[in-house]
């Protein structure tokens, strides 16, 4: 299959990239996180975008690695902000090396992402715009944790920024490397944004109801953290008589929240089915 071929190419390049890193405290977390089992969706989209417009996957490998580096940089810092204990079933970088090293190593990954994406000025410009939008999306995500009145439309814009624009960027960069024109770039990027929305909604469901052994993440981690996911927003909108239960739990500290109770209520309200149907 196409994705399996892309994943094989990317995994081989990631292994070589990790093996070439200096053996020190700054680079060890990069090699650790990049070396964990991963789907490699974003770099695969770079290769796909390149081949769709007549280019060679091998010709876009630097850009694919750059996108994967940036994605893992965001994961490293997101895990710090979320106080997440696990990433892909393994201890997060800040749990293993400490917060300070995780921050610094993540910063260095961002620099390396820019280096990998430096061949084409147009790619550099597209990536810079995308990186800023991803940061804007992450800030909205954190802002929403402190608000009780987040609507579905606001949430969809947040996940467009946090997730959709990076998938769009990956496909657009691949098309640029292949020499695609502006209209084709715009079309493939629009597809990437919609794919990103679906990807994030599915991730919301897996975070809440997925098997930790399969997802590699703590079940209900977003609910425990009070994140305004689609599930929680729609649950608060639907829970007329039970709205107080969700609000009471959200008023507690994260460690004190009855997460199984909250997840049970959300499923009973039908928001899981609604998210999966979108």
Please place each PLM-identified region on the residue numbering.
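All-alpha prenyltransferase/terpene-synthase fold signal
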Residues: 1-278
């Amino acid at each position: 299959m196409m994705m399996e071929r892309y994943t094989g190419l990317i995994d081989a390049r990631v292994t070589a990239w990790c093996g070439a890193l200096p053996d020190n405290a700054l680079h060890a977390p990069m090699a650790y996180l990049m070396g964990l089992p991963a789907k490699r969706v974003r770099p695969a989209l770079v290769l796909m975008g390149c081949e769709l417009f007549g280019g060679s996957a091998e010709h876009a490998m630097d850009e694919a690695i750059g996108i994967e580096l940036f994605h893992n940089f965001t994961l490293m810092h997101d895990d710090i902000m979320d106080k997440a204990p696990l990433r892909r079933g393994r201890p997060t970088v800040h749990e293993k090396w400490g917060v300070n090293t995780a921050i610094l190593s993540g910063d260095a990954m961002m620099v390396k992402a820019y280096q990998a994406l430096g061949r084409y000025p147009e790619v550099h410009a597209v990536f810079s715009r995308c990186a800023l939008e991803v940061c804007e999306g992450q800030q909205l995500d954190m802002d929403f944790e402190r608000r009780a009145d987040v609507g579905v439309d606001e949430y969809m814009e947040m996940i467009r920024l946090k997730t959709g624009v990076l998938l769009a960027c990956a496909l657009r960069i691949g098309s640029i490397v292949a020499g695609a024109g502006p209209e084709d770039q715009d079309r493939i990027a629009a597809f990437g944004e919609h794919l990103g929305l679906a990807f994030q909604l599915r991730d919301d469901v897996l975070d809440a109801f997925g098997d930790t052994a399969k997802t590699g993440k703590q079940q209900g981690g977003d609910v425990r953290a009070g994140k305004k996911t689609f599930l929680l927003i729609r649950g608060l909108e639907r829970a007329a008589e039970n709205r107080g239960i969700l609000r009471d739990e959200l008023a507690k500290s994260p460690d004190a929240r009855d997460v199984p109770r909250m997840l049970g209520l959300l499923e009973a309200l039908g928001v899981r089915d609604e998210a999966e149907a979108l």
